Swiss-Prot record:
Keywords in alphabetical order: ATP-binding, Magnesium, Nucleotide-binding, Transferase, tRNA processing
Catalytically driven reaction(s): adenosine(37) in tRNA + dimethylallyl diphosphate = N(6)-dimethylallyladenosine(37) in tRNA + diphosphate
UniProt KW Transferase keyword: yes
Keyword Coiled coil attributed: no
Taxonomic source organism: Blochmanniella pennsylvanica (strain BPEN)
Residues that bind substrate: 4-9
Gene Ontology MF term list: ATP binding; tRNA dimethylallyltransferase activity
Name recorded for this polypeptide: tRNA dimethylallyltransferase
Source taxon at top rank: Bacteria
Segments forming a coiled coil: none
Quaternary structure (record): Monomer.
Similarity annotation: Belongs to the IPP transferase family.
Alphabetical list of InterPro entries matching this protein: Dimethylallyltransferase, IPT, P-loop_NTPase
Enzyme nomenclature, EC number: 2.5.1.75
Length: 304
């Protein structure tokens, strides 16, 4: 696992070249979508031929996909990989997906768009501090774990309570399915945040050079992606800013600035998750070859 633009995909592909008996499972909430290749930095066809990735291109952009969906899909893929006497190698930056795998799946009510819309309206009217304070009053344990700026999870925690009458914390204690696997956890992180931010900026400009705008135009021309219910795919970093540009809300230069800033903010959130993550083996992404060596050594030592 690691922040965006840290070189996770390159490391995974290199490891696959060295150790054929690993199969890669993508842990990325953006890579699941078809027709969203450039803006998600999805591995290209040549890379996927060398190192196929599970759980890539499994949803249309109009479809929803939850952490619970990922849990079930990843569990199924890991079972199949192990039965083939290979080792599952999970790679990505969607920390909530990793957390779901490690902590287990507990049954939650389905989303309710009206409740979400009402909460978002109230947040715009009174401010997110008040919405977070409401969560503190209802479910202080969850509120303590959810940052004020993590609006999506604040909404979800309140939504769960208003639907079920039970808090997120209470539901976790009622029934919790945990996977039977033992995980070895690695974090691939550059030596400095400035270097990571430089990579992010360079990658965003490279995406524009190879056709990111045209990719989003094709999505923008789909009427089914303009409905209020479609939020997950179009809210992906980069796509949201390009969508605003195509909608005429911002100009091209603003789109670039906002896209880079949003990606940096994503990386910052990912690093915050990782700093709090227990039992991590930290690897320097400035030297991916050495990082790959370290993982290979551990796999051999653990007889994986």
């Amino acid at each position: 696992m690691g922040p965006t633009a840290s070189g996770k995909t390159s490391l995974a592909i290199d490891l696959k070249k060295r150790k054929e008996k690993i199969d890669i499972i993508s842990v990325d909430s953006a890579l699941i979508y078809r027709d969203m290749d450039i803006g998600t930095a999805k591995p290209v066809a040549e890379e996927l031929k060398l190192a196929p990735h599970k759980l890539i291109n499994i949803r249309d952009p109009v479809e929803c996909y939850s952490a619970a969906d990922f849990y079930r899909d990843a569990d199924n893929e890991m079972e199949n990989i192990i039965q083939s006497e290979h080792t599952p190698f999970l790679v990505g930056g969607t920390m909530l997906y990793f957390k779901t795998l490690l902590d287990g799946l507990f049954f939650l009510p389905a989303t309710n768009q009206k409740i979400r819309d009402d909460l978002e309206y109230e947040a715009k009217r009174t401010g997110w501090i008040n919405i977070h304070d409401l969560l503190k009053h209802i479910d202080p344990i969850s509120a303590n774990k959810i940052h004020l700026n993590d609006h999506k999870r604040i909404i979800r925690a309140l939504e769960i309570f208003f639907i079920s009458g039970k808090t997120w914390t209470e539901l976790k204690l009622i029934n919790n399915q945990k996977l039977k696997y033992r995980f070895h956890q690695f974090a691939v992180v550059p030596s400095s945040r400035d270097l990571l931010y430089k990579r992010i900026e360079e990658r965003f400009h490279r995406m524009l050079d190879i056709g990111f705008e045209d990719e989003v135009i094709k999505l923008f021309n789909r009427s089914d992606l303009h409905t209020k219910e479609v939020k997950s795919s179009i809210s992906c970093v980069g796509y949201r800013q390009m969508w605003e540009y195509l909608s005429g809300d911002i100009n091209y230069n603003q789109m670039i600035i906002k896209g880079i800033c949003a990606t940096r903010q994503l990386a910052k959130r990912q690093l915050t998750w990782l700093r709090r993550w227990p039992n991590l083996c930290w690897l320097n992404s400035d030297n991916l070859s050495a990082a790959t060596d370290s993982i290979s050594k551990i796999l051999i030592e653990k007889s994986i």
